[in-house]
Amino acid sequence: METKTVAITMGDPAGIGPEIIVKALSEDGLNGAPLVVIGCLATLKRLQAKGITPNVELRAIERVAEARFAPGIIHVIDEPLAQPEALEAGKVQAQAGDLAYRCVKRATELALRGDVQAIATAPLNKEALHLAGHNYPGHTELLATLTHSRDYAMVLYTDKLKVIHVSTHIALRKFLDTLSTARVETVIGIADTFLKRVGYVKPRIAVAGVNPHAGENGLFGDEETRILTPAITDARAKGMDVYGPCPPDTVFLQAYEGQYDMVVAMYHDQGHIPLKLLGFYDGVNITAGLPFIRTSADHGTAFDIAWTGKAKSESMAVSIKLAMQLA
């Protein structure tokens, strides 16, 4: 059987990414698995020397084909910092943002070439990314640009709750101006395709409303009747099992209890808050609509605890395992 290899990007090296990657790859189930880290080898060794990460072998390779996977060995394709000795933990730095960008770019190239079958990303810092001149709102938009993907969406994934977003990194004030029937219908379609890929035969998809009580028949806004309902009607006509618009304050609980397989959230915090409340340590961020599987730990760089040994690796480990499963 063909080995499915996953590339793991370091994210911002001044954050918890280097720590949680090495911790995750030292766990049972991932120790010795077909995984390749793309990041600054000097930074990984620096954390290991401080006793922050397990004492495993960090083996440098130039190509994925050179890897010989075995327990106790982590293979690293080195993307060096310009000044590794100048890197400071927990601080926004241009060289850290540039490294995070280069790691994602390298992993994307490997995935598009078929050298790896999926990528799992550790968190990057958006301010550092911008400071380095890479003006993307986050991983999702960066990956879409690198892969020339037009129809894509952010999925947050746990065993009991799955959420896909119509919009993500946009000011709430601007969100309503960009909301369209076409975009909502596209995201419903992405949700249906994604759920079928992960094993759902007839996915049940709920569409959350925009306004309180999903507009209450126009009393609190008309986006539901004017924008969402036509998208739902069109999706149903294509054979999709879609419900809504549903009141946002109850639809996530209904999905959590098994009534729906995925919720279409309208904007960033509408989808993120319930999922992070219920699955902060085991939630996974997935970019649906790319030509390959991309997963990520569902948290940020945690600069406040960077390089202290306090970072928990559960979400990173779950994201890597899911990438292996879906690849």
Curated annotation (Swiss-Prot):
Species in which this protein is naturally found: Salmonella typhimurium (strain LT2 / SGSC1412 / ATCC 700720)
Family, as annotated: Belongs to the PdxA family. PdxA2 subfamily.
Binding residues annotated for a divalent metal cation, in chain numbering: H169, H213, H268
Quaternary structure, from the entry: Homodimer.
Knocked-out gene: effects: Deletion mutant is unable to use D-threonate as a carbon source.
E.C. designation(s): 1.1.1.408
Gene designation per UniProt: pdxA2
Entry GO MF terms: metal ion binding; NAD binding; oxidoreductase activity
Residues in coiled coil: none
First-level EC class: oxidoreductase
Cofactor(s) essential for the protein: a divalent metal cation
Record's protein name: D-threonate 4-phosphate dehydrogenase
Alphabetical keyword list: Carbohydrate metabolism, Metal-binding, NAD, Oxidoreductase
Co-factor binding details: Binds 1 divalent metal cation per subunit.
Keyword Metal-binding: yes
